[in-house]
From Swiss-Prot:
Organism: Arabidopsis thaliana (Mouse-ear cress)
Subcellular location, record wording: Plastid, Chloroplast membrane
Protein's UniProt name: Fatty acid desaturase 4-like 2, chloroplastic
Highest taxon, organism lineage: Eukaryota
Origin organism lineage: Eukaryota, Viridiplantae, Streptophyta, Embryophyta, Tracheophyta
Family per similarity comment: Belongs to the fatty acid desaturase CarF family.
Annotated transmembrane regions: 68-90, 98-118, 178-198
Pathway listed: Lipid metabolism; fatty acid metabolism
EC numbers: 1.14.19.-
Record keywords: Chloroplast, Fatty acid metabolism, Lipid metabolism, Membrane, Oxidoreductase, Plastid, Transit peptide, Transmembrane, Transmembrane helix
GO molecular function: oxidoreductase activity
Annotated transit peptide: 1-30
Cellular component GO terms, alphabetical: chloroplast membrane
Keyword check for Plastid: yes
Length: 279
């Protein structure tokens, strides 16, 4: 009497910590054998889409509101940059606005680190003004690679809002080309810091050669320098513009000192003290 044995092997997902909407699809493999001779083993591979494809995840897609904020942010930065260039042509003084722009670039990296440290370690989705970004930050630490799947305006719109609301009044209030040399470069780096951050999670083969070149010479934060931020103890390499401040801040324990002060004064523990290992 023929006896058939059917065994089903289900490939369990290895991304248990990944939110449901971000988990990739997995396969169910069915292997069927028959004890009778001259019967071949049959392998049936059935693909089951457990969740929608990541590319269709609405949380990663841009909306028209996102695009409008990014357009507004770019416009305010362009106006500031134009005032700096026009003023430099008119006065024939290029050194001062150039130095101001360099200072803006350097301080933007520092600012990105302080902001990144704060949102990584304190607050939650109910925090005023930045709650949505704190929630996104925590999701990013659970699934770092998803930042490379975010559409352009989706990734930048939050920083674009802040840039617009701060730079627009400065555009209206000041015409000094040195002031705008600093403002335009600082605001540009803040506006696009999440793009630089996403590039730091990309692979060289998928990045534009110009971006890879800027990363290699240290003008933009690179994958090599940023990857340590996503490794235990999750309390370093917070700066995401150029990363030039990371070594200074980490070796001097600036953030650790700030965490101790906040804990002693307010009793608030940073998340990095108890951060689970997401790897």
């Amino acid at each position: 009497m023929a006896t058939s044995l059917q065994t089903k092997y289900t490939l369990n997902p290895i991304t248990n910590n990944i939110p449901r909407s971000h988990r990739p699809s997995f396969l169910r493999v069915t292997s069927t054998t028959n004890s009778q001779p001259n019967h071949e083993m049959k392998l049936v591979v059935e693909q089951r889409l457990v969740n929608p494809p990541l590319s269709n995840d609405p949380t990663l897609q841009s909306t028209w509101t996102h695009r409008l904020w990014v357009a507004a942010g770019c416009t305010t930065v362009f106006v500031s940059f134009s005032k700096s260039i026009i003023g430099a042509f008119g006065s024939h003084l290029w050194l001062e606005p150039s130095l101001a722009g360099f200072a803006g670039y350097i301080l933007a990296d520092l600012g990105s680190g302080v902001y990144h440290w704060a949102t990584d370690n304190y607050g939650d989705e109910s925090t005023p003004l930045v709650g949505i970004h704190i929630e996104d930050s925590q999701d990013h630490h659970k699934c770092p690679w998803t930042i490379t799947k975010r559409q352009f305006a989706n990734n930048l719109h939050f920083m674009a809002r802040g840039t617009t609301l701060i730079v627009l009044p400065l555009d209206l209030a000041f015409d000094d080309h040195v002031v705008h040399g600093f403002v335009s470069m600082f605001a540009f780096c803040v506006l696009f810091c999440q793009l630089f951050h996403a590039w730091a999670h990309g692979t060289k083969s998928k990045l534009p050669p110009l971006v890879v070149g800027l990363q290699d010479i240290g003008l933009l934060v690179s994958r090599i320098h940023h990857m340590n931020h996503h490794r235990a103890p999750y309390n370093n390499n917070y700066c995401v513009v150029s990363g030039v401040w990371n070594k200074v801040l980490d070796e001097s324990n600036v953030f650790k000192a700030m965490e101790m002060v906040l804990y002693i004064q307010l009793g608030v523990r940073p998340r990095s003290w108890t951060e689970p290992n997401y790897e």
